[in-house]
Each structure stands twice: as C-alpha cells, then as structure tokens.
Amino acid sequence: MRLRDAAKVIRSKNAGPTEITVDLMFNDAAGFARALEAPSLSAGVIAQRYGVQSVRIIPYPAANAIKIVIPRATTAGSPGDTDVSGAQQHRPLLDVEI
C-alpha cells in the first residue's frame, strides 16, 4: 500500500530556518502502526531519499501521527532556497510502499 493511500494527511512545512517537517496523519491506530513499523519509513531510508545525513522520526500515538524532521539543504529564504515555506517537500514520500 502506498503512503498516499494509507495516510489521511501528508504535508510538509517550514520548521524554522534550518529544518522542514513532514506530518503524516492516519485515520486509525492500525494505519499509524503500519507506517511506524514500515522499513521504508525508517530514519535511514528517509534520510537517503532526501539526500541528508539524518532525520528525526517523532511518533504521536495519541493522534495517530508521525512527524519527520528533515534538515534543510540551505537556510530558508537564502539564495538558492527553492521552497521557502517548505510546502512541497512531502512529495518524495507519497508513493513509498508501507
């Protein structure tokens, strides 16, 4: 099952000048657990997908949600920043199989 089909919400946003967050929200605990346990959503695999050294995975079981914190390649708003609001950075995860 693709992440886009399993999650109710997949969004990314600016989290300060040096980080972007991706929020994954699921309808129920089963979908949340499936995503949290999926090897394709491990910190190492996501870091590789985004071309960064590491990412942080923060689960929120009470909300059936997962937050992924990704370091920005460049400071928000600086020359070379192509997405100052970070709103388009969730795209690489949409078709991930979980």
Language model regions located:
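Acidic, aromatic-enriched beta-alpha/helix-loop junctions
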Residues: 30-60
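Helix-rich interaction surfaces within compact, conserved domain-sized segments
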Residues: 48-98
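Lumenal/extracellular ectodomains and adaptor appendage modules
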Residues: 10, 20, 40-43, 80-84, ...
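A broadly conserved detector of short glycine/acidic/proline-rich loop/turn motifs that flank catalytic sites
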Residues: 7, 30, 72-74
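Short, charged/polar N-terminal "headpieces" of proteins
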Residues: 1-18
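Residues at beta-strand starts and edge strands
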Residues: 18-20, 64
